[in-house]
């Protein structure tokens, strides 16, 4: 229902007219956030505030996807630092919240909540390795977490890990991570900490 937003727009435009009639020039008029840019072009005026759409992410499920085609541009990548076999009955990570029900092959990923990777993904998130899903085992720690690579062949130290983005035919989006955590997907775009290096790619090359 756009009617509340339309009321706000009319009030803004009316106020702007009154101010200008009083002799005050307003060079820039701004109302639209990401959702407004897509759903209310009449509110875009002469400057807009594109936030989450810059990442190629729709602002909410209420925004029609056929108006503007967005493609996610942000990825979060890491690598495997350690791989080992653990026996059935072994507790994994702090607090022993996950106990292996069989022999498992476990890989360590050097990313944690200090990097902005949510602790709420403990025991329910997953990453991509070799284009396959690897479930998170136990708690996400400050600087690392563990994943099950038992069914993924030949995982070794140094292999790429995709936390957000695409690997082969599989994809992990920020929206999906938000759903897993019961949190707003925007948070993950904002939470990635300064200690995580930013790499910008243009035409397939780092810039």
PLM feature segments, named:
Residues 1-79, 83-87, 153:
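Active-site loop/helix belt of alpha/beta enzymes
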Residues 83-207:
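C-terminal accessory subdomain/extension
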């Amino acid at each position: 229902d756009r009617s509340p937003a339309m009321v706000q727009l009319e009030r803004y435009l009316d106020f702007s007219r009154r101010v200008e009639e009083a002799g005050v020039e307003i060079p820039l008029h701004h109302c639209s956030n990401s959702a407004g840019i897509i759903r209310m072009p009449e509110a875009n005026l002469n400057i807009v505030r594109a936030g989450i759409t810059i990442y190629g992410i729709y602002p909410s499920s209420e925004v029609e996807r056929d108006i503007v085609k967005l493609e996610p541009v942000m990825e979060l990548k890491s690598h495997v630092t350690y791989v080992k076999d653990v026996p059935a009955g072994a507790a994994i990570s702090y607090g022993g919240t996950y106990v292996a029900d069989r022999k498992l092959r476990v890989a360590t990923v050097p990313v944690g909540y200090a990097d902005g990777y949510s602790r709420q993904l403990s025991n329910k998130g997953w990453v991509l390795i070799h284009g396959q899903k690897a479930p998170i085992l136990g708690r996400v720690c400050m600087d690392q977490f563990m994943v099950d690579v038992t069914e993924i062949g030949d995982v070794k130290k140094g292999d790429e890990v995709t936390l957000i983005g695409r690997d082969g035919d599989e994809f992990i989006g920020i929206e999906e991570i938000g759903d897993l955590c019961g949190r707003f997907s925007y948070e993950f775009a904002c939470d990635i900490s300064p200690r995580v290096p930013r790499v910008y790619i243009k035409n397939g090359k780092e810039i």
